[in-house]
């Protein structure tokens, strides 16, 4: 896709959420209620979501999305323009099965996963340079089917695997901001990931020792 055409990319984009846990649902609900065409790939939550929608409980305001965009397989969703990947990085081996039905020649991949090397895995697995990365700082927990509780935070540091960063990063950041998702562009995605890792080293063990304090969940 030519950069000159990106201004028209996101308003009409089809977006798939792959990994509908706390992180995927938190961002997906906001994008959907913000007016974007979001399609959720669900497993155990599928029937609940179809019956009563998906809900975000937050001090910033509760949200309910009860649209019809809940799917049990990637083939039902078909090709999209942007895939937001939020499964656990330890399950990356399933992406080879989940993603192909979603991919067209101009599909972008955005990983919101924790850990290092996720962008490289996506690039190598799908032989594409259309890979972006986002480092999430959000305290949220999926505590029952199709329901996420948000305790605080919600910022994404968004970066490109290419140098210089392509204009699509600006387009996605602007779209996320319009949907009330704080999104900052990172000029050095690798440094942002290492910064998050160092943050986690300090607080994740403390959170577990303290009985999984709500404010330390899914940071």
Predicted features and spans:
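Nucleotide donor/acceptor-binding cores
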Residues: 13-14, 81, 154
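Rossmann-like NAD(P)(H) cofactor-binding subdomain of soluble oxidoreductases
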Residues: 63-147
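Hydrophobic anchor at the start of a short beta-strand
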Residues: 15, 37-39, 128-131, 183
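Active-site-adjacent beta-strand anchor residues
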Residues: 17, 39-42, 85-86, 111-112, ...
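Residues at the C-termini of beta-strands that transition into short coil/loop
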Residues: 42, 60, 74, 113, ...
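Internal alpha-helical scaffold of NAD(P)-dependent oxidoreductase catalytic cores
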Residues: 101-102, 125-130, 143-219
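Short, charged/polar "capping" segments at the starts of alpha-helices
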Residues: 46-51, 119-120, 166
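NAD(P)+-binding Rossmann beta1-loop-alpha1 motif at the extreme N-terminus of oxidoreductases
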Residues: 2-62
